[in-house]
Amino acid sequence: ICRLLEIFKDKGLKVAVLKHDGHDFVPDVPGTDTYCQLQSGAYGTAVFSAGKYMLVKQQPQISEKELAEFFPEADLILLEGFKYSTYPKIEIIRKGNSAESVCNPEKLMAIATNLDAEERDALSVLENVPFFELDNAECIAEFILSDYFR
């Protein structure tokens, strides 16, 4: 995703990323005021400067759609995780990490992988789903842009 962001930025696009964490993440740096405030019971904190802000809010659930509303000026919003969402997906399948696609085939746009040809053939995915080399961010970026801006 970081390489894709560099490519999109070079093309003049403003891109946001929403990441789903299946675990409970630590949203701040230990020792900061806002970290201590959260640890002391604040249900939310915000820190900001002239050029950016960070908002942390204890909330049981928020949808990717609600999160996307924080970025109305974005040209493109990438989602990481969210394997069960209704948005189109490029699934990453890494050798030694996953052996099958877990995404809804109707939402699967492509697969980015480091599997060899024989291992790819063994995957049970739709025939019309394109494969990309995992490290070929330029081709993946062009695929995203051609689909998104058509």
Label each region the model flagged.
Residues 2-58:
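N-terminal phosphate/diphosphate-binding loop that engages ATP/GTP or pyrophosphate donors
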Residues 56-84:
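Phosphate-binding/switch loop-helix module in NTP-utilizing enzymes
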Residues 38-39, 47, 69-71, 101-104:
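Solvent-exposed alpha-helices and their adjacent loops that cap or buttress functional pockets
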Residues 11-14, 42-43, 72-74, 87, ...:
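Short coil/turn connectors at secondary-structure junctions
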Residues 76-133, 137-149:
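Phosphate/Mg2+-binding loops and adjacent switch elements
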Residues 31, 61-65, 96-97:
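Charged helix-capping and loop-helix junction motifs
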Residues 3, 32, 62, 135, ...:
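Conserved active-site and cofactor/substrate-binding residues in soluble primary-metabolism enzymes
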Residues 8, 70, 147-150:
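P-loop NTP-binding site
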